[in-house]
Structures are given as C-alpha cells and as structure tokens.
C-alpha cells in the first residue's frame, strides 16, 4: 500500500497545472461547482431567506445551493427552494448564468413562480419573507450574485423568453493563482463586494 500524495504540476499533454498523484500519475481535475437557485415571486413580490449557516449567516439571499448528481439544473433549483424556504414553485425560464472564477462557481438562476404566498424557514434558514422590489434592503443581501439576480429579475419582468443575464459589466474577476494553494473562498467583505 502506497501513501497517497499529490503535487501540482502540468501533466503530460496538458496545458494547466493540476494536482497529480505522485505514485500513479492520476490527475485530479479541479472543476467549477454548479450552483442552482431561483428568484421566487408571488404577485410581484420576491421571496427572500435569511441565512442560518455560514458564510454570511444572518444576511438575506434567494434560495440557491450546489447542484446534486442525478438532477437537472431546474430540478436542483426546485429542490433548493423546497429545502430553504419550504415552498413548491414552478421553475420557469433561466434568468441568469453568472460565472465567478475566483470562487470556482457557475450560478444558474431561474425564475420561480409561487402558486401561493405560503413559505417557511428550512433547515438552513432562520426567516423568510415576501417583499416588494423597492422594499429590499440591499445592504443586508448576502452576496453580490443575489443583488445581480434580483436586479435582473426586475429588469426582465414580464419577459418569459429565454433571456439569461451574465455577470454585470465592470465586475473585476481576480484570477486564481497558477501555483500554490487556492485562495480562501469565504464570505466577501464589504470592501470587495463587487470584486469576484
């Protein structure tokens, strides 16, 4: 039995540095994670959830989380809504696709139509509320992507066709280092809220 250890190097026939097993040359590809979620609405109001987990515990968000194996992006978005805000929604068209290379995530955010105003906190949520767009406390939102999704939802209100948005112009993407450890992907501070 050999000890498993990896080192970062460029594998043969590749162009990027990757973790490679020092014994068998197995390449451990580091790929972005897919996050799925929905801007859920009922009668012109949007559903927000107060996070009860880190990062950004106590801040407001839309229902979203990591996609699971064996589900479509739409199924994942519906599951996240059920888990976080105890609500069944009709998942509509794709609202936005945000690529955030600094934290290795691709966010697929859908429109979610609520059949009623019923909602409740799930296991990762301490509070839920339906709010009008002009009542959103923008300083209390957990992540820049939540702000983008809510604004894109407002801007595309009434348009049901496939019209996905992307990361807003002017957002600075910080590249990952080519060598060494990956940066801390913890919560964003107020000073780097629009730097992703």
Task: Please provide the spans of the model-predicted regions.
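Extracellular, disulfide-bonded carbohydrate-recognition/adhesion ectodomains
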Residues: 166-168, 172-173
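Conserved Nudix-box catalytic region and its N-terminal flanking loop in Nudix hydrolases
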Residues: 41-83
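Short connector loops at helix/strand junctions that flank enzyme active sites
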Residues: 16, 31-35, 41-43, 55-57, ...
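Unchanged
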Residues: 67-152, 156, 160-162, 175-176, ...
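Conserved hydrophobic/aromatic beta-strand scaffold that supports enzyme active sites
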Residues: 18-20, 39, 48, 109-111, ...
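Surface loops and adjacent helix of pleckstrin homology
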Residues: 33, 51, 141
